[in-house]
């Protein structure tokens, strides 16, 4: 499943295609959304926001389309009039004079008013988004030490969208490698220095991935360009200490780590 950086880059791509342009045609597959087709035609997409792995497409009339890709959903951008060659099932089409965005295969799709946005179950449940530029390491540290999260092992906590939205498995293993911690650690047992390192890594690694992944020089390192240090690198040497990276399963997901320097 795509993680926060991939979802945000997808949102950027969609925004670049249709933001600020009049919608000339709107189509929804689900019956409960059909009444909104006429309400949105002639409106504009004002912005596309991410909340972890969910997308919020905001329209100029105050409505917002909530969509969660889950495992199989995918957005596409095409030239208006183009006929895509795909076996996927179309769920949403938002068309402008020159570009059209299409949502395929997703099933978790709703139209929300401004009031409903504040009470939506998923949006209420998710924590702050790691790609929100307003979120600080100090706020992350406070969440780590809060009664709700301080006793949780990082193996599960760093996959919990209620803690921080947008994290996922590759970010989990890369953040813990950067912090020299294992998945069994808990925030309550860390030193002040370890907490500070982890709090920064929880923001720095996702933001670096968003900014550079997919266009990186494989010889670059954290702090310059993003690339995997342990994810999918089991059996290889750890570039920090020379130990051999291992693979196991934690919280039902593959976990990669260096047992020599992650203590």
From Swiss-Prot:
<keyword id="KW-0479">Metal-binding</keyword>
<dbReference type="InterPro" id="IPR023713">
    <property type="entry name" value="Endonuclease-VIII"/>
</dbReference>
<dbReference type="InterPro" id="IPR044091">
    <property type="entry name" value="EcNei-like_N"/>
</dbReference>
<feature type="zinc finger region" description="FPG-type">
    <location>
        <begin position="229"/>
        <end position="263"/>
    </location>
</feature>
<dbReference type="InterPro" id="IPR010663">
    <property type="entry name" value="Znf_FPG/IleRS"/>
</dbReference>
<keyword id="KW-0326">Glycosidase</keyword>
<feature type="binding site">
    <location>
        <position position="125"/>
    </location>
    <ligand>
        <name>DNA</name>
    </ligand>
</feature>
<feature type="binding site">
    <location>
        <position position="70"/>
    </location>
    <ligand>
        <name>DNA</name>
    </ligand>
</feature>
<dbReference type="InterPro" id="IPR000214">
    <property type="entry name" value="Znf_DNA_glyclase/AP_lyase"/>
</dbReference>
<keyword id="KW-0862">Zinc</keyword>
<dbReference type="InterPro" id="IPR035937">
    <property type="entry name" value="MutM-like_N-ter"/>
</dbReference>
<feature type="active site" description="Proton donor; for delta-elimination activity">
    <location>
        <position position="253"/>
    </location>
</feature>
<keyword id="KW-0378">Hydrolase</keyword>
<feature type="active site" description="Proton donor">
    <location>
        <position position="3"/>
    </location>
</feature>
<comment type="function">
    <text>Involved in base excision repair of DNA damaged by oxidation or by mutagenic agents. Acts as a DNA glycosylase that recognizes and removes damaged bases. Has a preference for oxidized pyrimidines, such as thymine glycol, 5,6-dihydrouracil and 5,6-dihydrothymine. Has AP (apurinic/apyrimidinic) lyase activity and introduces nicks in the DNA strand. Cleaves the DNA backbone by beta-delta elimination to generate a single-strand break at the site of the removed base with both 3'- and 5'-phosphates.</text>
</comment>
<keyword id="KW-0456">Lyase</keyword>
<feature type="active site" description="Proton donor; for beta-elimination activity">
    <location>
        <position position="53"/>
    </location>
</feature>
<keyword id="KW-0863">Zinc-finger</keyword>
<keyword id="KW-0511">Multifunctional enzyme</keyword>
<keyword id="KW-0234">DNA repair</keyword>
<dbReference type="GO" id="GO:0003684">
    <property type="term" value="F:damaged DNA binding"/>
</dbReference>
<dbReference type="Pfam" id="PF01149">
    <property type="entry name" value="Fapy_DNA_glyco"/>
</dbReference>
<dbReference type="Pfam" id="PF06831">
    <property type="entry name" value="H2TH"/>
</dbReference>
<keyword id="KW-0238">DNA-binding</keyword>
<feature type="active site" description="Schiff-base intermediate with DNA">
    <location>
        <position position="2"/>
    </location>
</feature>
<dbReference type="InterPro" id="IPR010979">
    <property type="entry name" value="Ribosomal_uS13-like_H2TH"/>
</dbReference>
<dbReference type="GO" id="GO:0000703">
    <property type="term" value="F:oxidized pyrimidine nucleobase lesion DNA N-glycosylase activity"/>
</dbReference>
<dbReference type="GO" id="GO:0006284">
    <property type="term" value="P:base-excision repair"/>
</dbReference>
<dbReference type="GO" id="GO:0008270">
    <property type="term" value="F:zinc ion binding"/>
</dbReference>
<dbReference type="InterPro" id="IPR015887">
    <property type="entry name" value="DNA_glyclase_Znf_dom_DNA_BS"/>
</dbReference>
<keyword id="KW-0227">DNA damage</keyword>
<dbReference type="Pfam" id="PF06827">
    <property type="entry name" value="zf-FPG_IleRS"/>
</dbReference>
<dbReference type="InterPro" id="IPR015886">
    <property type="entry name" value="DNA_glyclase/AP_lyase_DNA-bd"/>
</dbReference>
<comment type="similarity">
    <text>Belongs to the FPG family.</text>
</comment>
<dbReference type="GO" id="GO:0140078">
    <property type="term" value="F:class I DNA-(apurinic or apyrimidinic site) endonuclease activity"/>
</dbReference>
<protein>
    <recommendedName>
        <fullName>Endonuclease 8</fullName>
        <ecNumber>3.2.2.-</ecNumber>
        <ecNumber>4.2.99.18</ecNumber>
    </recommendedName>
</protein>
<feature type="binding site">
    <location>
        <position position="169"/>
    </location>
    <ligand>
        <name>DNA</name>
    </ligand>
</feature>
<dbReference type="InterPro" id="IPR012319">
    <property type="entry name" value="FPG_cat"/>
</dbReference>
């Amino acid at each position: 499943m795509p993680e926060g950086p991939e979802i945000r880059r997808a949102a950027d791509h969609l925004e670049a295609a249709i933001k600020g342009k009049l919608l000339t045609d709107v189509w929804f597959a689900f019956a409960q959304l059909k009444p909104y087709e006429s309400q949105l035609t002639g409106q504009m997409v004002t912005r596309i926001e991410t909340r972890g792995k969910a997308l919020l497409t905001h329209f100029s009339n105050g409505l917002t389309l909530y969509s969660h890709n889950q495992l199989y959903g995918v957005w596409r951008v095409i030239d208006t009039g183009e006929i895509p060659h795909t076996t996927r099932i179309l769920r949403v089409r938002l068309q402008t004079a020159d570009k059209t965005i299409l949502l395929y295969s997703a099933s978790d799709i709703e139209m929300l008013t401004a009031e409903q946005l504040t009470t939506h179950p998923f949006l209420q449940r998710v924590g702050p988004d790691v790609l929100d530029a307003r979120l600080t390491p100090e706020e992350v540290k406070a969440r780590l030490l809060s009664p709700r999260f301080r006793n949780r092992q990082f193996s599960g906590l760093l996959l919990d969208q209620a803690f921080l939205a947008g994290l996922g498995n590759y970010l989990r293993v890369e953040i813990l490698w950067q912090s020299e911690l294992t998945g069994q650690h808990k925030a309550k047992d860390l030193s002040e220095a370890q907490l500070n390192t982890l709090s920064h890594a929880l923001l720095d690694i996702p933001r670096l991935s968003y900014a550079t992944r997919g266009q990186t020089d494989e010889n670059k390192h954290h702090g310059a360009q993003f690339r995997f240090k342990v994810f999918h690198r089991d059996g290889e040497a750890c570039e920090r200490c020379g130990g051999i990276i291992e693979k196991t399963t934690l919280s039902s997901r593959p976990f990669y780590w260096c047992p020599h320097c992650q203590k």
